[in-house]
Amino acid sequence: IYQLSDNGTMAVVLPHGVLFRGASEGTIREYLIKEKNYLDAVIGLPANIFFGTSIPTCILVFKKCRENEDNILFIDASKDFEPGKNQNRLRDDDVNKIIETYKSRVEKPKYCHVAPLSEIAENEYNLNIPRYVDTFEEEEEIDIKVVQQDLKRIDKEIAEVDKELNVYLKELGLEEI
């Protein structure tokens, strides 16, 4: 970052751990955000897109001359990829979606969030993406009455199969179940 010109932009690919680990990494995050305000965006990438490692990675975008000084953009692109046998791949559409989201800085539910610096301070400079981008999916409600009916039907089918099986076992001279 020191080598970056005053109007330069730098993007760094790192493992997700740098977003939330404590100790010196936490101190560095706080310094880069609170003291210098260089961090412009955090982009979460899918796991297994880089050769030789399956860990999820992220891109940190730094700018010394930020246009949006009061917030940081969080993008969760971890679900947008083409699965591969040995390695996952970002498609052109996936990359374009990231770029367009970065340029527009518009909130998209379950994909990106523009977090004010106060929110990041409240989270003690922990940049873990799920703290900022809610990706929780509601589970479908289970109708207990339907499940009970299914269980009764299945029990009845099992009883019929057992009855038929006992006929065959009896014919073979074997003990019934």
What are these language model-derived features?
Residues I1-I177:
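A conserved structural/catalytic subdomain of Rossmann-like adenosyl-cofactor enzymes
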